[in-house]
Every structure is written in structure tokens, then in C-alpha cells.
Amino acid sequence: MKRYIALLLALTLLLSGCTAAQQTEKTETSTQTEITEETEETRETVETPEDDNSFGLSYLPEYGLNPYTCTATVNRALFSLLYESLFSISTQFRAEPVLCESYRMIDEGRTYVFTLVEGATFSDGTPLTAEDVEASIQAARSSSYYKFRLSRISYYTTQEDGTLLIQVSTPYENLPLILDIPVVKKESVSEAYPVGTGPYKLQGDRLVRNGHWKQTQEPVLDRDTIELSACGSTGELRDNFEFGSTDLVYCDPNNAASVGYRCDYEVWEVPTTVMHYLGFNLYSGYFANNTLRSAVTYLLDREEIVTEFYGGFALGSSLPCSPYSDLYDAQLAESYDYAPTQFRAALQESGILTSPEYEYHQGIFLVCSDDMVRVETARYIARLLNDAGLNIVVSALDHDTYLKELNDGDFDLYYGETRLTPNFDLSEFFRSDGNLQYGSIKSTSLAELCTAALENTGSFVELCAQVAQEAPICPVVFKSYAVYVTRGKITSLTPTVDNVFHDSASARSLADADKTYENADPTMD
């Protein structure tokens, strides 16, 4: 999604160094929504540098450029220039083959065999092998950013024919969706600046073209050199972008760390899998009542929440899935969308307002004070609940205290954040060893539905329907990140969370690589 903005005014641009790990609270007929919204404002513009072909990027060197350990959002903008992965994930959360030429699914989805693109080479001239991919997966399994998505991978090895074999503990219909992991040379996986196969390579304080790059099309960012500026603070990042030495900034525009700046830019919105949601205590307090709990979704005007508290950089969803994903069912989502009269009817039916048990009850609403967007949103939701007749008090706590209270179960509800996988696997909420089962929401039946949805994506709608009915959680929004670019420096961009310079025009389809049913050996099925 691109928004055109030409203006000279003070803004709150978030150049935060850090993003949340895979589970941020713990350590923490299908309709596709069109992604084409354009708005325009015209005010006084700022002159751009005469050398329109120059391009600069800033980064925070203390975080390095290792894709498995780096948590600096601004640094991750460089990853799609330096590294490639077996698959890339589009803005519609579809897997697109990159370093994978083809693959086969066997053993009813428990085993995958991947064939690499022929002739792919690292920037130092050494050929890419399945052993490099194997080493990259191993590094990712130890990474807070990737490890949860890979938890079901039980075995992987390089085969004699040079292919990569991956086995999973439960059948996967679409394993490529979680394999958008940067691949680096196996000898460099632990280095701060690993060797990759991307269109550029690091050379001193600049990026230069990788002469060994396999792809035939020109990269989205088509420059011979890209100047890098090492920064020690978000203030330096702001100054570099404002005064022209940096032409692109990738950030979470709703992060707590923010700086103001003045410049002329274009901005692209980046859909993410980061979900903000209400979690409930199922065994004490107001929301132990299922009738009330399952009706909270009707009280939430998500469009207003997105506008008022997220500055438009989020997408409301009553389902635990981004509306941009093929898994999203618009008809089901609509049935659980904003309908305040239905909430009030359910509140009356619940008997909460007339029950002596709740006459003096004070409901505790936990939220992490490190994130003011979540705090303000929680306060807004609390006002709605109180206006309806409940007695809710927001308790905004520092991160460590917040997690302790969640683990102790001392709450009625909380406003949480988690980074879901691109296939929107909800298992961490419901399986017995899950990391997000605050409020005793673990559920054998829901965990089984999560597994069924991995095996057959058609089961995801049933999972969403059951989650909405039982309401252990209530999705509110999916966050968006932003790519700010000096006006005129890039004309076309379709950025994704881990591929800022994603090129949708030249992307291959997953069907192009799927050879599961092509000349299949019946003895392997």
C-alpha cells in the first residue's frame, strides 16, 4: 500500500532500533482485501539533491547485519539487498520461490524435498549449496526472531543429489510459507556481517553490486553503489534522513521510541503479522462468563481504533488473521465485527450486571506501559466497557512486572501483542507447552484445530470460527510498518516485512515450483 505525502511539517517518525521477537509477550469462500489506497496532500516541498542517482542508507552498527540476531528494524531494510531466501512472502502472505527452483511434498506433507536454483552464487563467488541452507536453518532455530515458526521441523539434511530434505512433526500443506529465512554462507552464519547471495554486497562503508548475483532482472533499487551511514542513535538517523544522506528509513511507526523530523517523502505501508489482541482470564473475573467474553468483539469499532490510536498504520481484524491473507474469510469476519447493540444484549443475558458476585468487583486490565499506543487503546476499550456498566481499571506496568502479572493470572483481561507466523499458526496460545496461554486458555480442541489448519488450510476458517465462539482471545488489529523514501528516489515498491525491496512484478508463483504431483514416484507416497 502506498501513500503519497508531500509536506513540510513536524511528524513523529519512529526510527526505533528494536522490534519484538517472534512471541513478543513471552520473551512472549475466502475474500482477499485489495491493497491499493492512495491519499495525497500538497504543501510546500523541499528541494531534492541534484544527483538524483545517488542513494544512501543509514544503519545501527551495534546491531550488526546478521539476519538471525539483528533486532534493529532500520538494519533489516538492508537484508533484502544482501540476502535471499528459499522463498519470499508477498504482501498477501503468499510464498514466492527465490532460491528454491522446485520442491516436492511427500509422506502426506510430513517431508519436503527442495531443489535449489542452479548457478546461485554467494557474493564472494562460492556456489550456493543445500549445506548453506541447512546451516542457515540451524542458525534460525536458535534465533528469537525465527525459532517459534521452526519448532515443528524435526529433521533436515543435505542429500547426495544436492537437494535439501526437511521433515516436520505434523503434516504441513504449505511449509514454504515459513521458509522466508535469509540464507547465508555456512561459514559465516555467526558473523556480524554474513555473506549472502543478494544483489549487493558490503564493501567498507557502502553497498556495491554483487557481480555474482544470479537473477536476470534489475533490482528494485537500481544503483551501482549505495552509501551507508553508521549511526549511534535515532537522532542521527533522523538527521541523516532529514538532510539527505539517507534516502530510506524502515520503521514501526507506532513504536514507543520516536523522534520528530521535517522533510519531503513518500511512504509505503508494510502489512505485518503482528497482532494486537485482548486476552481473557477464563477462570476468574468478569470474562470467565463466556456469553460476555464472546461478545466483546462487538463493542470494538476497529476502524476508529486504527485511525485514532495507530495513525492509520494498522488493519482492524475480528479474526486472528490479516485481511490481506488468503486465509481470511470476510463473511465470517463481518459476523463478529462492530455491533454495539449485540454487545449490550449479551451483557444483559450474561447476568453480570445483576449478579451479587460482581457487585463490588473491580476488573483489572493489564497492558505493558512500554507501548503507549497499546496503553491508550486499552484505556479507550476500558471506557467502552465501563460505559456499558462494568468496573474496569487499566493497570499499565513495566514489561517485567506485566509479564509476571500475566503469568500469575492476576487480571480480568489484557491487551497483548504477538508476532504470528506468515501462516497465522495460533498453536502458542492453545497447546500445552505454548508460550501465550495466559489466563489458562490452553485448549486441547483448539490446539487440534491449529494442527488441522496446518495440514489443510481449508480448516483455518473452522479454527477462526471456534476461536470467535469460545473467545479466549479477541483480535483487534494487525500492525503495519512503514518505508519512508525521499521523494522521487524510488518509483515502484511493494515492500514486505522482511523484504523491503520486494519486486512483485518479477516474482514467481508457488505453483511454478511445486512439483509434488509431477512425475511422482508412487513408492515415495
Q: What are the functions of these language-model segments?
A:
Residues Q167, P171-E227, S233-G235, D512-N519, ...:
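Gly/Pro-rich hinge or "lid" segments in bacterial periplasmic/extracellular proteins
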Residues S350-L420:
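Ligand/substrate-recognition segments at binding pockets and active sites
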Residues L57-M105, Q138:
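N-terminal lobe/hinge region of extracytoplasmic solute-binding protein
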Residues T157, Q203-R206, E227-Y283:
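Extracellular/periplasmic solute-recognition and catalytic clefts
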